[in-house]
Amino acid sequence: MSDVRLRFAPSPTGYLHVGGARTALFNWLLARKQGGTFILRIEDTDVARSTQESVDAILQGMEWLGLDWDEGPFYQSERFPVYREFVERLLAEGKAYRCYCTPEELEARREQAMKEGRKPKYDGTCRDLVTQDADRPFVVRFRAPHEGVTAFDDLIKGRIAFNNEELDDLIIQRTDGTPTYNFVVVIDDATMGITTVIRGDDHINNTPRQILLYEALGYPVPRFAHVPMILGADKTRLSKRHGATSVMAYRDMGFLPEAMVNYLVRLGWSHGDEEIFSRQDLVEKFTIEAVGKSAGVFNPDKLLWLNHHYIKESSPERLAELLVPFLRERGVDPSTGPSLPQVVKTLQERSRTLVEMADGALFYYRSEISYDEEAAAKHLVPGTLPLLASLAEKLDACADFSHSGLEAAFKEFIAEKGIKFGQLGPAVRVSLCGGTASPGIYEVVEALGKDETLRRLRRAVAYLEQ
């Protein structure tokens, strides 16, 4: 295993968002490509908003996507003593100081700066205080340099530089003794030996402050890669108003994990004109430098196209297993009807999602299918009664109920009757499936089996005889 170490560090304040999932994927792929270590860390310092339910949802989303982690999950809430040690160390070294300014004082100074057209930032009132008052509430601030430039070479965005005079003296510990995000993320990444930080580009402005903390603590600065955000079709940040944003919502909508992985990685990264990538392809071909600088637009139609591809490519046995809960939601027990893998085989070419497949499979498992009124009125007419009755007799005598055997039997029947397939096919579809939109007739008959096929044909004959 190489020394490369990457991490995904979500906050457990909600579900695993598609943007977070893509960030996790990029980290996972780079770790796997370089033979490194992928670490999962839960950033739960916001105790009021963090929930176990969210932790469970994040872990479930990671597992569904197949993003296995090598270390963790680590929880920041369990590391508070570690953070306090580093705060004390910075205080002892004069690299941090206690600030006694009240929120009211800070707000007044902020408003004054705005009035004067200055950028609001901490004015350093307590930066060089000689006397300390342990009885007064205080925060701890990092003593940032006010001169020079802090720059880094972003693996996606290129060189980014900040004038240090623009940077605040960052609060690293609140009045209640809890550490702040920008501080703990540095301590965690430093002590966990993270070598590359891949995260959303909303963190770019945090980076110079974090680099200064690394340097003050004497730790090597990792490489940074800031991933552009994901937008909705209207070019605004992807949110619930654009549709589902939770990874697990897409699972529940009948998407396959490999389709979601393929889609999310391609949303911002490319390798020539290729669209379809297996997991192994992605591990071999992915580079963070090939991620685009501009935001990606989430396209549900493209995801549907990919999902359809993977449904067509998957084994019927695997899809059957995944389909069971969708059928049960619809009141169907698939163990009571035809072979589910056989049914799946008839629906793979037509189904873009497992939801569509489950809906398309219902007629196989309902003993008393209802006929579509328009289709029945058009195709279940008196003239088809003798044809359906004769077909039932023909199939009853058919010894080979395989696809090829059924095709031969139907062709023979049509020739015997001197008709065209179009005069028979729609009536058979309505009889067996309830409507004319269905898989191929031979596939349906083969999946239903002889007994059920004959029962449905004879039921249609009885319907016509009424």
UniProtKB/Swiss-Prot annotation:
Its cofactor is Zn(2+). NCBIfam families: gltX_bact (TIGR00464), PRK05710.1-4 (NF004315). GO terms for molecular function: ATP binding; glutamate-tRNA ligase activity; tRNA binding; zinc ion binding. It catalyses: tRNA(Glu) + L-glutamate + ATP = L-glutamyl-tRNA(Glu) + AMP + diphosphate. Catalyzes the attachment of glutamate to tRNA(Glu) in a two-step reaction: glutamate is first activated by ATP to form Glu-AMP and then transferred to the acceptor end of tRNA(Glu). A motif ('HIGH' region) lies at residues 10-20. Belongs to the class-I aminoacyl-tRNA synthetase family. Glutamate--tRNA ligase type 1 subfamily. It is found in: Cytoplasm. This is Glutamate--tRNA ligase. SUPFAM superfamilies: An anticodon-binding domain of class I aminoacyl-tRNA synthetases, Nucleotidylyl transferase. Monomer. Zn(2+) binds at residues 99, 101, 126, 128. One of its GO terms (biological process) is glutamyl-tRNA aminoacylation. GO terms for cellular component: cytosol. The keyword Nucleotide-binding applies. ATP binds at residue 240. PROSITE patterns: AA_TRNA_LIGASE_I (PS00178). The gene is gltX.
